[in-house]
């Protein structure tokens, strides 16, 4: 099992004096259940696990009473160990299937804060927005979980190389031996992506298993569309989801409704886009032509790009074979750029860097991401390889003179005045590397 960084956040949650019941959000199969079980086994004397989509009787308990002591007592009868305050982690999985259990968290917070309760659900984001029940606003803690990062993948694949990776503490170029080995590991990660079951197949060098598992996950997502949306909305969700590869195949990546379906209009597909966002399956990045703080005030919500939650899923959704990453075929060059952008976004978001805007100046220049950091706006350009020609970042610098410019590419780590080149495989270390800029 991967050593997930979110375990540290869970440990901090456990020790908080003002701890509330936890709602862990995240797309299906990013590893929420396995992480919570490991956390319960390692950090508590006991772990009581209930899956509310499989155990209908458990949901009945929440329907019949709102008293947390009575709920705890009845749940204890269903486990081999008593559920004890401070000593037991109570895990309520797939809680979106039991709205009464979500509502009950208010009473757990107010009346029995000594009990550690962690809730998870693949479609909790949808439940918050669309189910007709009372959500316990202010009575729960939230935590977001994402696919396995490259750094987590690297630790499992090569512990020694991971130690070096985490020890990088300057902007000096990496020695060739480390750069080359990290590049090789990164190629493996880009093929598999970060869905835990898939990434583990890659660790085991089971390439056939990688492809099969990715296809199975995509099939599960398609079934979710049908199960959790009306027939009309499910059809539109599927159209948007399947259009993702063609949306990113264009040079400017801007979302075009005509690629979803001929004659499609925004008002018909807005709900489908929102559904995919709330389910954690896509990221939406809006145009911001005036990169001033706060970026939110200058965004154009009508012009945007969408990306997948995971670069491995995007590759298979686009029907690209793993060999594409090992080829220098110019036909694949443009889509390599899209996959590189998707990876950088995935890495930044997972590591706590809000990345929801890009910059463009007409049709002449575009910077893939701009990130607000305090009172500064940092432009971030993404290149998939070692060919880094292009004038967009130069044009941005000429117009706005930012304190820092970042380019991600497969060139070595380098600092030149206010410009920093970060190898794609070091994106997980972006926050630390920015801190080394003087």
Locate each region found by the language model.
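N-terminal pre-Walker A segment at the start of P-loop NTPase domains
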Residues: 1-15
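Hydrophobic anchor at the beta1->P-loop junction of P-loop NTPases
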Residues: 24
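Conserved lysine of the Walker
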Residues: 32
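Hydrophobic positions on the alpha1 helix immediately C-terminal to the Walker A/P-loop
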Residues: 35, 39
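Short glycine-rich substrate-engagement loop in P-loop NTPases that contacts/grips substrate
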Residues: 54-85
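Structural recognition of the conserved hydrophobic beta-strand(s) that form the central parallel beta-sheet
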Residues: 91, 116-122
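Interdomain motor-coupling "hinge/lid" segment immediately C-terminal to the ATP-binding subdomain
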Residues: 128-249
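Accessory nucleic acid-recognition modules appended to NTPase machines
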Residues: 200-371
């Amino acid at each position: 099992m991967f050593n997930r960084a979110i375990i540290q956040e869970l440990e901090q949650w456990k020790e908080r004096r003002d701890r509330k019941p936890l709602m862990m959000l995240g797309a299906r199969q990013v590893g929420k259940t396995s992480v919570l079980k490991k956390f319960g086994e390692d950090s508590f004397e006991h772990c009581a696990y209930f899956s509310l989509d499989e155990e209908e009787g458990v949901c009945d308990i929440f329907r019949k009473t709102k008293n947390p002591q009575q709920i705890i007592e009845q749940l204890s009868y269903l486990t081999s160990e008593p559920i004890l305050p401070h000593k037991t982690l109570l895990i309520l999985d797939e809680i979106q299937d039991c709205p009464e259990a979500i509502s009950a968290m208010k009473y757990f917070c107010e009346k029995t804060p000594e009990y550690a309760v962690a809730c998870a659900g693949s479609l909790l984001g949808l439940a918050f927005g669309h189910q007709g029940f009372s959500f316990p606003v202010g009575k729960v803690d939230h935590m977001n979980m994402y696919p396995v990062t490259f750094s987590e993948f690297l630790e499992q694949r090569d512990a020694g190389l991971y130690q070096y990776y985490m020890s990088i503490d300057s902007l000096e170029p990496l020695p060739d031996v480390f750069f080359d080995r990290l590049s090789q590991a990164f190629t493996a990660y880009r093929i598999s992506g970060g869905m835990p079951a898939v990434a583990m197949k890659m660790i085991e060098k089971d390439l056939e298993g990688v492809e099969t598992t990715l296809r199975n996950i995509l099939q599960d997502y398609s079934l979710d569309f049908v199960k959790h949306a009306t027939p009309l909305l499910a059809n539109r969700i599927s159209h948007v989801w399947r259009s993702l590869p063609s949306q990113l195949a264009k040079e400017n990546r801007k979302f075009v409704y005509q690629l979803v379906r001929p004659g499609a209009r925004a008002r018909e597909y807005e709900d489908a886009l929102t559904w995919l966002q709330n389910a954690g399956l896509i990221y939406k990045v809006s145009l911001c032509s005036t990169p001033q703080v706060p970026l939110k005030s200058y965004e154009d919500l009508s012009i945007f790009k969408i990306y997948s939650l995971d670069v491995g899923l995007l590759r298979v959704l686009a029907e690209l074979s793993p060999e594409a990453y090992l080829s220098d075929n110019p036909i694949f060059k443009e889509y390599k750029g899209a996959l590189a952008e998707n990876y950088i976004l995935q890495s930044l978001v997972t590591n706590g860097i809000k990345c929801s805007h890009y910059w463009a100046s007409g049709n002449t220049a575009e910077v893939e991401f701009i990130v607000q950091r305090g009172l500064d706006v940092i432009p971030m350009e993404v290149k998939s390889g070692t060919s880094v020609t292009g004038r967009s970042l130069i044009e941005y610098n000429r117009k706005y003179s930012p304190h820092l410019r970042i380019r991600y590419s497969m060139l070595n780590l380098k600092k030149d005045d206010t410009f920093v080149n970060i190898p794609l495989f070091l994106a997980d270390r972006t926050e630390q590397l920015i801190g080394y800029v003087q």
